[in-house]
Swiss-Prot record:
This is Adenylate kinase. Keywords: ATP-binding, Cytoplasm, Kinase, Nucleotide biosynthesis, Nucleotide-binding, Transferase. It catalyses: AMP + ATP = 2 ADP. The gene is adk. AMP binds at T31, R36, G57, L58, V59, G85, F86, P87, R88, Q92, R156, R167. Its EC number is 2.7.4.3. Residues 30-59 are annotated as: NMP. Catalyzes the reversible transfer of the terminal phosphate group between ATP and AMP. Plays an important role in cellular energy homeostasis and in adenine nucleotide metabolism. One of its GO terms (cellular component) is cytoplasm. ATP binds at G10, A11, G12, K13, G14, T15, R123, I132, Y133, G201.
Amino acid sequence: MRVILLGAPGAGKGTQAKFITEKFGIPQVSTGDMLRAAVKAETELGLKAKSVMDSGGLVSDDLIIGLIKDRLAQPDCANGVLFDGFPRTIPQAEALLKAGLEIDHVLEIAVDDEEIVKRMSGRRVHEGSGRIYHTIFNPPKVECIDDVTGEPLLQRKDDVEETVRHRLSVYHAQTKPLVEFYSKLEAKDGKPKCSHIPGVGSVEEITAKVLEALK
């Protein structure tokens, strides 16, 4: 079973990805991890990618597809794979299709933008321990102070509202169109199966919907 998991930053993809990989015994494959592994192993594709990255360029979709083919040939992918962060764009999805790499399921975890902004911009972190609080959902006893050490809490740069809104706009421009792309493919060819899952409610409720969609 090959699964693509889509959703805006902050939609809760990480939690559901962990559930899917454990439940179905398939690896989570990210292009970043593949690139690093190929470069470290000094494979032919890894050396090509390193040359491009060292010169400040972007690794081409063709090169990424080559890495994916190599990765899918490994024994742990025999039962399937969960794609993490790929494809991100229509050209990448088309390249995947052209390479004959079939996808069985496309899951979109859908959460309203304002809910995501509320979730992410409210996060506060204790740098020393990594403890995470939230101004609304899990506030510290004293505002902006760690419960255990009494030290100040920080807001990560990625969680600043302006940054969150920028990342959401990039997602809507580049990755959201993939939902329509794969839905049209499903209507035409009968696969991949596309499922739209509301990412609100408890983790358990969302997980149950994910499991139902993958049956």
